[in-house]
């Protein structure tokens, strides 16, 4: 029973709550709808007001800044017309003002004429007085000016003497300074000329040394090629028996012709080798920078400076030869001094180089003061006799060839 009653009570309370909610729900919805509607209307109104404000500002700006000058003039003229119309609204008052002005002018004219006459008389008197006073003042000023001139002349006499003395002293000092500057400039010029002359002498010495080295290299190559070939011929002749003098003349003639042909071929080969080994080819006018006679200086760190100096010396047409290449040789020497590890031989003293070359030539038998020929033993004397016999027999061979 208790549970049933409690259930009924609970159900009643739930029904009441549901009824209340059902009654309140439409009002809540309506309030929500109306509140949202009013909010939207207020926002639309704000937007509308802002749009009107922006449009007004734009129109005002267009009127002020964008309107053409003719319209502005028109507006100004309209304003002036309005102002004139406002000022001329009372014609009666204007007529009264004009009449009063004419009366005043008529009354003021005789007064003005009298005032002018009195003013003219006063002006004439004042002019007379001012003229008399001006003459007296001019006389006084003239007298004062004359007195001042006399005083200034008296004072300027001793001052002029002192000024002349000062000027003469200044002139003397200026002359001394100019003389000192000229002497200093002349001394500096002489020192520069001495330095340049010494540099020219050094460069000329280097040029001559380079030329000598080139000639020595070419001579050494020729001598070495000849020495390489002459020992072979001497060995062949030395191996021949001692009874060569008793051989018939035909064998001598044939050996002579063979020897002459070989000598001509040897000379041609030597000339070709010299041409190949020389750096400058006069036929083509080109310089072989890969020539071993240059010692690889054209490809070192100072290769460009060496090429410039060497080509200038080769193609130089000045007298003496290479005088116009002094600066380039100086640049080359400066570059050599910067790289002593690569150009130690070129930077050594020329006297030491000459001594070294002399010792080498002595060791190889190439010195000019020592004969490079082997000692004159019996075999060598025999070969000389054979050469004499061949030379004596050469005219007979020429005649025989002509007859054939």
From Swiss-Prot:
Residues 136-156, 226-237, 246-276, 357-391 have a biased composition (Basic and acidic residues). Monomer. Residues 72-404 are mitochondrial intermembrane. GO terms for molecular function: protein-disulfide reductase activity. Its cofactor is Cu(2+); Zn(2+). Residues 299-343 form the CHCH domain. It is found in: Mitochondrion inner membrane. It is a single-pass type II membrane protein. Residues 1-34 form a transit peptide. The CHCH domain contains a conserved twin Cys-X(9)-Cys motif which is required for import and stability of MIA40 in mitochondria. It holds the Pfam family CHCH. Residues 124-135 have a biased composition (Polar residues). Residues 35-50 are mitochondrial matrix. Residues 84-287, 346-404 are annotated as: Disordered. The keyword Repeat does not apply. The chain crosses the membrane at residues 51-71. A motif (Cx9C motif 1) lies at residues 302-312. The keyword Hydrolase does not apply. GO terms for biological process: protein import into mitochondrial intermembrane space. It comes from the Eukaryota. Residues 101-113 have a biased composition (Low complexity). Keywords: Disulfide bond, Membrane, Mitochondrion, Mitochondrion inner membrane, Oxidoreductase, Protein transport, Redox-active center, Signal-anchor, Transit peptide, Translocation, Transmembrane, Transmembrane helix, Transport. Coiled coil: none annotated. Signal peptide: none annotated. Cu(2+) or Zn(2+). This is Mitochondrial intermembrane space import and assembly protein 40. The lineage of its organism: Eukaryota, Fungi, Dikarya, Ascomycota, Saccharomycotina. The gene is MIA40. It comes from Candida glabrata (strain ATCC 2001 / BCRC 20586 / JCM 3761 / NBRC 0622 / NRRL Y-65 / CBS 138).
């Amino acid at each position: 029973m208790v549970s049933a009653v409690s259930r009924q009570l609970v159900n009643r309370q739930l029904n009441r709550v549901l009824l209340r909610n059902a009654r309140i729900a439409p009002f809540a919805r309506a309030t929500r709808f109306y509140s949202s509607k009013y909010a939207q209307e207020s926002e639309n109104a704000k937007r509308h007001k802002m749009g009107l404000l922006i449009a007004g500002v734009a129109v005002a700006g267009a009127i002020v800044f964008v309107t053409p000058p003719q319209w502005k003039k028109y507006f100004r003229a309209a304003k002036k017309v309005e102002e004139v119309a406002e000022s001329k609204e009372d014609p009666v008052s204007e007529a009264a003002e004009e009449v009063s002005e004419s009366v005043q002018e008529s009354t003021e004219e005789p007064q003005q004429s009298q005032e002018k006459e009195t003013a003219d008389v006063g002006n004439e008197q004042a002019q007379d007085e001012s003229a008399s006073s001006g003459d007296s003042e001019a006389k006084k000023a003239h007298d004062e000016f004359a007195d001042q001139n006399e005083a200034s002349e008296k004072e300027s006499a001793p001052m002029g003497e002192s000024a002349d003395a000062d000027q003469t002293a200044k002139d003397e000092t200026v002359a001394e300074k100019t003389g000192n500057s000229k002497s200093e400039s002349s001394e500096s010029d002489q020192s520069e000329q001495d330095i340049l002359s010494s540099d020219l002498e050094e460069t000329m010495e280097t040029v001559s040394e380079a030329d000598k080295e080139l000639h020595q290299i070419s001579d050494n190559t020729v001598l070495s090629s000849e020495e390489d070939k002459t020992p072979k011929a001497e060995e062949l002749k030395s191996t021949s028996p001692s009874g060569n003098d008793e051989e018939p003349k035909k064998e001598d003639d044939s050996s002579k012709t063979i020897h002459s042909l070989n000598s001509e071929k040897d000379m041609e080969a030597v000339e070709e080798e010299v041409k190949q080994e020389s750096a400058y080819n006069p036929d083509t006018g080109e310089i072989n920078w890969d020539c071993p006679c240059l010692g690889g200086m054209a490809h070192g760190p100072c290769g460009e400076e060496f090429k410039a100096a060497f080509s200038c010396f080769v193609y130089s047409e000045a007298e003496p030869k290479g005088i116009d290449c002094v600066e380039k040789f100086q640049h080359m020497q400066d570059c050599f001094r910067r790289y002593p590890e690569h150009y130690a031989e070129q930077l050594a003293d020329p006297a030491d180089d000459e001594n070294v070359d002399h010792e080498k030539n002595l060791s190889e038998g190439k010195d000019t003061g020592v004969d490079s020929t082997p000692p004159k033993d019996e075999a060598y004397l025999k070969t000389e006799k054979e050469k004499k016999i061949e030379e004596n027999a050469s005219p007979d061979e020429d005649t025989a060839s002509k007859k054939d």
